[in-house]
Amino acid sequence: MSIESKAYHLIQPGEFEYTTINHEFRDGDVIVNPSKASVCHADLRYYTGNRRKEALDKKLPMALFHEGIGTIEDSKHPDYQKGDKVVIVPNIPSRLRAGDFEETDLLDNYDENAVFMGSGYDGICQDRMVVPGDNIVKIPDTLDEDVALLAELCSVSLFPINQLKEITTKSSPQVAVFGDGPVGYLAATALHYIYGIEIENLIVFGAIEEKLQSFENFATTHLVFDYDFNSHKGVHTVFECCGGKFSESAINQAIDLIDRQGQIVLMGVTEDLVGINTRDVLEKGLTLSGSSRSTKHEFEQLIASFENEEYQQALKKLIPDEYYDIHSTEDLKKAMDDTAAHKGWKKTYLRYHWS
């Protein structure tokens, strides 16, 4: 069975086009009507053209956005029914896709034949999405849907924490986060509210004092400019959440800071090559690992964890005071232009009105 969806395609940086998309609706699938989406920096990189030309040529035209919620219009999956409010899990592994793909023992977010919404595969900027039923998670009636809309962003920070065998040790009881933006904030909140890392053992380094003040209810904070990283003892794990032009300095400060046989998790995205102090990586016996995206497990874990009122209050600092109401390509362009021009700390939320 085929269904038609209205969509806004990004056809080139800065330009959207209203179009229609056809989807096959198969057994095990659900039709979701996206109601709200949240803008990610990855979306902005496509919109502003801040991606390599070959990536833009390969992936556009495309419907943006991978952070979204919606309501089920129809279901061929036994666990979901019409009217359910759901969070959309954007990574569709090959085992859930139509087609003949080689089996893999890789995690879903590292499956080479997976597709990811808003990254070479049409995302949440459409009125009807057909997704596997295993790619959604129900939103409880008691949960604020604006908090639920943060699930994807939270999941990206939670996934690498879940992968670690141990976050701390007896002799190195501390965890550090580099980055005072949303990714660092969500990594720190997960470490405190889900994993129970206490304030005195959770250290956040940043460059802007006003941003660091938002962390002070659950973490110890320091500015990077005047901190003596080499003299600090007690950190076993560091999460690098800076990205961009700050990746190199953050990684090397983390190498200076961390105890021997510690672990550094790289989460910040940069388009540039960075120089790393490999001599001290070797001398200290450090482990560096990368992390990208997440799995459905993190979404389920988060929806359950969002029941914690203190966690909810911490997350609400990222929720904007107003939505952008999207009736047309002009509305969408304004929302993206504003977001690109004013890269504030709070998220940009879009509310769809399809005619």
What do the predicted segments below correspond to?
Residues 38, 76, 91, 242-246, ...:
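Short glycine-/small-residue-rich Rossmann-like dinucleotide-binding loops
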Residues 67-69, 84-85, 128, 180, ...:
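Residue-level marker of beta-strand positions
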Residues 93-174:
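NAD(P)H dinucleotide-binding glycine-rich loop of Rossmann-like/cofactor-binding domains
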Residues 143-228:
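Mid-domain Rossmann-like dinucleotide-binding core that forms the NAD(H)/NADP(H) cofactor-binding site
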